[in-house]
Amino acid sequence: MTQKFEMADRFNPSAVEQALYQHWEESGYFKPSENENAPSYCIAIPPPNVTGSLHMGHAFQQTLMDTLIRFNRMEGHNTLWQAGTDHAGIATQMVVERKIAAEEGKTRHDYGREAFINKIWDWKAYSGGTISQQMRRLGNSIDWERERFTMDDGLSNAVKEVFVRLHEEGLIYRGKRLVNWDPKLHTAISDLEVENKESKGSLWHFRYPLANDAKTADGKDYLVVATTRPETMLGDTAVAVHPEDERYQSLIGKTVILPLANREIPIIADEYVDREFGTGVVKITPAHDFNDYEVGKRHNLPMVNVLTLNANIRDEAEIIGTDGKPLAGYEATIPADYRGLERFAARKKIVADFEALGLLDEIKPHDLKVPYGDRGGVPIEPMLTDQWYVSVKPLADVAIKAVEDGEIQFVPKQYENLYFSWMRDIQDWCISRQLWWGHRIPAWYDAEGNVYVARNEEEVRSKYNLDSAVELKQDEDVLDTWFSSGLWTFSTLGWPEQTKELKMFHPTDVLITGFDIIFFWVARMIMFTMHFVKDENGKPQVPFKTVYVTGLIRDEQGQKMSKSKGNVLDPIDMIDGISLEDLLEKRTGNMMQPQLAEKIAKATRKEFAEGIAAHGTDALRFTLAALASNGRDINWDMKRLEGYRNFCNKLWNASRFVLTNEKLDLSQGEIEFSLADRWIQSEFNRTVETFRNSLSQYRFDLCANAIYEFTWNQFCDWYLELTKPVFANGNAAQIRAASQTLVHVLEKLLRLAHPLIPFITEEIWQKVKGFVDITADSIMLQPFPQVEENCFDPEAEAEIEWLKEVIVAVRNIRAESNIAPSKGLDLLFRNLSAENAKILEKQTALLKAMAKLDNVQVLAANETAPLAVAKLVGNAELLVPMAGFINKEAELARLTKEIEKYQNEVKRIENKLSNEAFVAKAPEAVIAKEREKQAEYQSGLEKIQEQYKAIEAL
């Protein structure tokens, strides 16, 4: 077996990762087996933005997904990881708009709709593959031939189908309601795209004169109204007070004169009003504030829209009733002085005019949150516009029940409450966007403005009996991106066709996603899926059985990673490494706010003075898994990454040690398993059990810890060392047993670790497989290790644990007394239990070899020991005679520390047992255990004190 000598000194990830991945992909190993007799397992990846690039959050979530996918594939399941990308309407349109502005000095309007959309498709073709290539670098075992895009023909058909069916069911309608309006981008945006920024503003107190000689309780002929938005006051249709506010109760139902506009508006009572805010009187502007909009609906107030879509003051107010239709007979003229003014210029002028009229009572500083569009970067305006809506309440009820009944489980469970709180207070969903890039709304208008909804124009004409003379114009708007991504689990599997993939893989098994999109995406997927996908009995299908919610990956200081903070880490840089110069360019080039560049460069130079070293994909994946404690945000830690790169090197070196051992004997013949062989097999079996249990609970951190602990602390640090005496002095049967155990445990360990660290395990496994007579092509398709009940050996575990403690105690004595490792020592035991005496008898040779001992002796009960350094292992006293070795002062200093340690433990337990609350609440068994520990420490303390006296007397 000459191949065992062909293993490089070091593992070089960059030399093997991409070649291995290419081989896996070309061999079709990522495809489902389509074995109808095997259980199916499917994960649908949250589709990243098509023009985006991979960030640490993607790497984190995808590592966890790939671990589950690889594990289930090795379990023999028919496994599909469904991937794809999202067209990301507003984000993609903006990227391309910025690009043509920078390169050609043009806007999308210069191109026109069709040409601009073609420009986006070109951009998608150019940059759309970036993220897929980066995902390959992570080792993601995705069936790339099934990759989908939310604007593929198939998915577009599914979107139209859903829209038309919901419209036919009366669940989609068009109406004029208040939305988040971005005055720069000229589109409605979702709450998720609104960023509330802390701002130092003002609270203006204006006097609104009372009409018809009415007076307040304290004799004033006006009410003082507090507002943070003077510019919208021209659209006021009421002022409101709290119904129980005694100051104003007598005025409810009376009217005030709206200054500047000179129209009468009512004083209404509503519990929405906070009596403590300002003066306890607020203006109600239903067309320009979400809360006021709800108040307006309750009191049947007209909505007076005074802003254009650019957020300038209109020439004529638009007056709408609570039914969303134009309202006749309500006068609301906008004074000429304000027409056409930009909203903040209007604010200034209105405040100045109030002051000139003597109606400005006071201005107070006020901290407030101003909503900004996260893409347009300007304050959002609540705006009355015509939009398409989904009436989601009927869909939400079914989706709530699915979680209540446990058909869908959230991990961690506390996220169910967040889901319920959103879903039980759900509002109709605005699904139209005033963009060009996206799924065009399948609705057409005739010259009279009648609306026709169907899958295409041809269907409109046949469905509504319209001949070709009727001119039709398609709705200009596109659908909210979340509408199409809400269909993701079933549209990607071929719905509305009843495909074999849909039958085989739906519902999917688990969704791994961030908490921030539970409502925007997760809830909508549940609602849409359960409405449109039914099983053979007509029961609504869930999209997935489990939602595993991850935290955010933050930087080492706990800050959110963002381009503007300059603290973004690119997963590919963790894999390949990056120079400081390139990292600086990446973090400070093309910045939206160039003034931050110097600060970012300084922080980067401090943190990454040498740049970032290459760590390889496996080290990155292992780190991400090890940090994945349930649902918590993660502070990224470069030291952990280095530690896990060292772990990969340790695994490589251990494998090399095993496979290049010239004494390795895998021939047929008699075998005699040693205690160490039995122990390592039992330990491995426990590790498999821990890994499987942890993975079933989505505790990826515990899976990683189990592999790390076994590989580093048991296999490498102990078992490899325990085999050295066998290879040096064992008989043929013992050497065969050690050889078999080494190679078989290593091969199984590689299979166990493969889902987490696929590249290094495949690379080593290719070298190991010949030693264990496996001819298969890839570790990927090997069975995942099972828990083997007959491999548990508690006796071997207990015996080795005791021997390890003895060996460590002797090694510590050597280190503390500065005795060279090569120098043979004698070891004496006192107070040795019968059980441990038996172990010692059988394992003396092993103990001598491992602890470099010349002699091992058990002292009789009354036998005096020579001058010696002592350590305790349980109740047994270990004595190493020090004639010719000892440094009296150093030994006394060491014993003083030991005495302090034992005294502290005795004191700690005494305090615990004298704590009445502890004794009252703790179970009897716990108290008994503490008393037992107390006796052990007390006894140990006395022995060390005796030893101290003995050495002091020398």
Curated annotation (Swiss-Prot):
Motif stretch ('HIGH' region): 48-58
Catalytic activity: tRNA(Val) + L-valine + ATP = L-valyl-tRNA(Val) + AMP + diphosphate
Annotated keywords: Aminoacyl-tRNA synthetase, ATP-binding, Coiled coil, Cytoplasm, Ligase, Nucleotide-binding, Protein biosynthesis
Main location per the UniProt record: cytoplasm
Residues annotated to bind ATP: K563
Annotated GO biological process: valyl-tRNA aminoacylation
Cellular component terms (Gene Ontology): cytosol
Claim: Protein biosynthesis is one of the keywords in the record: yes
Position of sequence motif 'KMSKS' region: 560-564
UniProt-annotated location(s): Cytoplasm
Entry keyword Transcription regulation: no
Molecular-function GO term, any one: valine-tRNA ligase activity
Coiled-coil region: 883-953
EC number(s) per entry: 6.1.1.9
Subunit (UniProt): Monomer.
UniProt family annotation: Belongs to the class-I aminoacyl-tRNA synthetase family. ValS type 1 subfamily.
HAMAP family in UniProt: Val_tRNA_synth_type1 (MF_02004)
Function text: Catalyzes the attachment of valine to tRNA(Val). As ValRS can inadvertently accommodate and process structurally similar amino acids such as threonine, to avoid such errors, it has a 'posttransfer' editing activity that hydrolyzes mischarged Thr-tRNA(Val) in a tRNA-dependent manner.
Domain comment (free text): ValRS has two distinct active sites: one for aminoacylation and one for editing. The misactivated threonine is translocated from the active site to the editing site. The C-terminal coiled-coil domain is crucial for aminoacylation activity.
Name of this chain's protein: Valine--tRNA ligase
Gene of this entry: valS
